[in-house]
Amino acid sequence: MGSIPEFSIRDLMEAGVHLGHKAGRWNPAMAPYIYGVHRYKDIHIIDLRKTAVLLRNALSVLYDVVHRRGRVLFVGTKVQASNVIAEEAARCGQYYVNHRWLGGMLTNWETVSSSIRRLLDFEKLLNDTDAKFTKKELLMFDKKREKLERSLGGIREMGGLPHILFVIDTNKEHIAIQEANKLKIPVVAVLDTNSDPRGVDYPIPGNDDSIRSIDFFCRAVSNTILEAIRSDLMSSGISVAGSVGQAKDGSVVDSGKGKSIAAHKGGGKASKGAAEVVAGGSVVSASGGEDAVVQE
C-alpha cells in the first residue's frame, strides 16, 4: 500500500481543526472527542490526538476504496464548503454534490440517471449549430440545462452509485447520510462538536465551519485519492514518472507523461507561533494568540 499524506498535530491546529462550537450548542454524543472548554471563549476544544488517529484511519479506508477502483462522492453544500468540495473532487478525478442534495440522489439512482441523460441531451441540443430553434426556445433550454448542471454536474460522469461518501457537516447533509446508510454505502465525515455522529462509519472530529479547516480535510482526502490512483497504475505496470494532477478537461493525468488516467475512475511548514500540544496534555500558544487554551 502507498502512503497517505503526512500531517502533524501542529498542522491540524494551524488549520483551526480544534475549534468547536459554543459549549452550550454541543451534541453530548461528541463527548469522547472533546478535550475541554476554552476558558475565555466558552467554546469546546476538539481533542486533536483523537482527530489525528481517526483521520489517518479514514484516509486509509479511502485509499483502499480508490485502489480497488471504487468511486468517492464528496458532499458539502454549505457556503464555506461548496467551492473547495468541487475543486478537490475534480482535482482527484472523483465526484461531488456541492449545491443542494436532492432527495433520492442515491436511493432513486435510476431517476437521477434519467435526469443526467436529460442534462446531456440539453447540452447536445444547445451545441447543435444546425438545430432550428427560436432564441426563446434556446433560452428556455439553457435555463433547464443550468438548473440540472447545478444539481447534477458533479455526478454527471459517475456512472453508478458511489462506493463511499466523504461528508462535510453531518447535520446539513443528514439526508445524504441516511440514504447512504440505507444502501450500506460507508460514510466518512468531519464531525464538529454539535454534530450527530449516528450513521457515520469513519468519523473525523474537527471544525466543519472554518474554510481553512474544510480546505485541510478536503485536500488530505484528495491527495490520498491521487496517491491511491498512482499506486494502482504502477501496480498495473503503467509508468507514472511525474506527479498525478488534473488536465484541463477534468481528467486525472500523469504530469510526467501527460497520459490521461480517467479510466481509473469507477472501475507545510508550520509557523513558529502556532499553538501546539505540550506535556501534560495542555494546549498552549507560543505566540499567545486567540486560539490559546490551557486545560487544567
Curated annotation (Swiss-Prot):
SUPFAM superfamilies xref list: Ribosomal protein S2
Gene Ontology BP terms: translation
Gene3D superfamilies the record matches: Glucose-6-phosphate isomerase like protein, domain 1 (3.40.50.10490), Helix hairpin bin (1.10.287.610)
Keywords of this entry: Ribonucleoprotein, Ribosomal protein
One protein family per Pfam: Ribosomal_S2
Origin superkingdom: Bacteria
One Gene Ontology molecular-function label: structural constituent of ribosome
GO annotation, cellular component aspect: cytosolic small ribosomal subunit
Keyword Translocase set for record: no
Transmembrane stretches, start-end: none
Region named Disordered: 246-272
Family: Belongs to the universal ribosomal protein uS2 family.
Protein name: Small ribosomal subunit protein uS2
Chain's gene name: rpsB
